[in-house]
Amino acid sequence: MSYPRVKRLSEEIKKIVSDSIRNELRDPRISSMTSIVEVDVTRDLRYVNIYVSVLGNEKEKADTMEGLTKASGFIRREIGKKIKARYTPEVIFKLDESIEKGIYMYNVITKVNEENHLSEDDSNDTEDDSDE
């Protein structure tokens, strides 16, 4: 069952957090290649899970998550200023690696397709040689 108010609130929080990360946070630990993938607000509106994707190496990911965790109080205040709700939800950042996994799977599939194409070409060449 979908809750329209929770969905609207999630979308609004996503905009606020994206804007805050892009324009207001000055923490050098936070990578410029950080994006908000998804925002889930609990039904009781007390907590918000913010799924973040960071393109970069493991150190950049860890540094970005540390910076975002330290800035969660600031981001919570920004959310509180801009939404009308009885409670301002507690912000919880979580690393989402689905984009990296998708890129990895795409590369694996591409490699397998190339290998299959090459093996088909080799088998066609041997058949052509045997016909002569």
UniProtKB/Swiss-Prot annotation:
Q: Which GO terms describe its cellular component?
A: cytosol
Q: Which UniProt keywords apply?
A: Cytoplasm, Ribosome biogenesis
Mention one GO molecular function: ribosomal small subunit binding
Disulphide bonds in the chain: none
An example Gene Ontology biological process: maturation of SSU-rRNA
Note the Pfam families from the entry: RBFA
The domain of life is: Bacteria
InterPro entries named in the record: KH_dom-like_a/b, RbfA, RbfA_dom_sf
- Function recorded in the entry: One of several proteins that assist in the late maturation steps of the functional core of the 30S ribosomal subunit. Associates with free 30S ribosomal subunits (but not with 30S subunits that are part of 70S ribosomes or polysomes). Required for efficient processing of 16S rRNA. May interact with the 5'-terminal helix region of 16S rRNA.
Q: How does it assemble?
A: Monomer. Binds 30S ribosomal subunits, but not 50S ribosomal subunits or 70S ribosomes.
Provide the family line.
Answer: Belongs to the RbfA family.
This chain belongs to which protein, by name? Answer: Ribosome-binding factor A
